[in-house]
Amino acid sequence: QIVRMIPTLKVNNRRLNELFYIETLGMKPLLEESAFLSLGDQSGIEKMVLEESPSMRSRKVEGTKKLARLIVKVENPSEIEALLARMDKIPQLYKGTKGYAFEVLSPEGDLVLIHAEDDIKDLKKVDETVTFSKDEKLQYLTAFDISVEINLPEETTSLLEKEEIENGLAFKQAQGSDLLVDNNVTWD
């Protein structure tokens, strides 16, 4: 049985990605060790790891990435508004029963959805301009959970049982030559 899943993202430029995940998404740096950066929330529990892999060892993904989307579910919806207030340019907004959500691309081109809903199907796209109030007290998110959507090559299924992964992983069929390469080959 899988007890806890901690996504590890391979990145080319850790510093650029570190700034994005900390300043834009409000994740707290927990431990920095050589090529690894552990990120979490105020609880101090590790939720995600960034692993720097320089271009002499890995390369950019050609075509579709294995990571379809990183989904961050925030416990306190008002913290999402505080994150949005810090941004110079507001990304794609959504609204749900608990509040706002947004989708943004990381420096590596990974799609990240930040929300507080029980079900992301409740989110509706917001097209009008919205202004958010700054919250100087918020430095890092109080509590959040991460799940991932993974692209699998067409005609492929996961070896994991649905009960094992609960809501932590979702699989989508996709096409792309790099969906079948080893983990150490690309930044994905």
Which role does the model predict for each range below?
Residues 88-149, 161-188:
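Vicinal oxygen chelate
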Residues 8-47, 51-53, 150-182:
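Core segments of cupin and vicinal oxygen chelate
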Residues 1, 61-65, 138-143:
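Short, flexible turn/loop "capping" segments at secondary-structure junctions
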Residues 19-20, 78-85, 102:
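Short amphipathic alpha-helices within nucleic acid-binding modules
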Residues 71-72, 148-150:
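Short, well-ordered beta-strand elements within core beta-sheets of diverse protein domains
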Residues 13-14, 75-79, 108, 154-155:
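Helix N-cap motif at beta-to-alpha junctions
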Residues 4-7, 27, 48, 67-68, ...:
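Short, structured motif recognition centered on aromatic/hydrophobic residues
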Residues 50-78:
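A broadly used, surface-exposed interaction patch
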